[in-house]
């Protein structure tokens, strides 16, 4: 059976781990993060990195809201006719058609441009991080008035460009820039500047990782045969990673209060090892599995997590991916670990980008951080991957009921210390 689930925070601020996304992919039928079929006009030859963006960040001092409490004093005009809108997308390093962050974000921009009657969406793929700023500026120079930048790595350059170009709207996917009182990126991480006030033309898209993690926990506990499930995060200094794991544990225990949920982090200080080292992830997971004996393992560690899934596959246990449908993204990257992935906890990137582009054109989008969760179809869980038949109708009902509970508030997916590692 194929899992059909549709639901809609990474509260983060700075850059560190690359994320990919793009167009032209064939997506599996699902109400979760369905991507438009429009293909990118160009696809660079660089191999996709196929990693989720669980980047290190500094936690903002206030929770993001869909509508920031501070009204911007000025913002770019949203009264332009459809023909006046021009949308550009700057992806992270990799390819547009990576079945990951770049692809789904790009497809959301294409859908949004179609909704508002704009022309073809232009896309730029950097060869490396040094090109972020110049590619963003190129779109400014060529008259694009909605610029979508994909992933945490572009947060600083996006904020700098937004400050310098108040007549252009910027959509930062999975971004919450830390800015000072002038609106510039704050290297001291004081984050004293208010985004909505100082960057009234910037929208940072954030997601409820705890809700997506909760759904993954439901699946894990439901398919576990030995009542022991595990989760490995990249580092406990990233609130988004911690939220995923906290939600996962609560979701698993909602199915089986007596289940053993073992969680750990690959590193406590080294972000490179935490998110960009598949070998370290595999070695860590090998020992984790040997020591704790889970028969389901959830990864929240970017590229490092790909190694975690490889370890799970080698050990003959089930894997759960993160951020995007990793059954597809790892297969696209020729990583055999995809064969063991039952499902993935998703951020609905295409849905959220499309909604934001459409709202900008309609004049209803406020600046600051926009929060996507179950209520607005911002998060979800992937169709069943390699574990064909594992997700039964009964498990699907548990998932559907949990989504309904998230929407009406009866299901709590994160403790009071949400996002803070104990």
Regions found by a protein language model. Name each.
Residues 1-10:
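Bacterial N-terminal signal peptides that target proteins for export
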Residues 16-19:
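C-terminal motif of bacterial Sec signal peptides marking the signal peptidase cleavage site
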Residues 21-24:
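Bacterial signal peptide processing site
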Residues 28-54:
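Post-signal peptide N-terminal segment of mature Sec-exported envelope proteins
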Residues 44-51, 55-422:
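A residue-level marker of the well-folded mature domains of exported/periplasmic proteins
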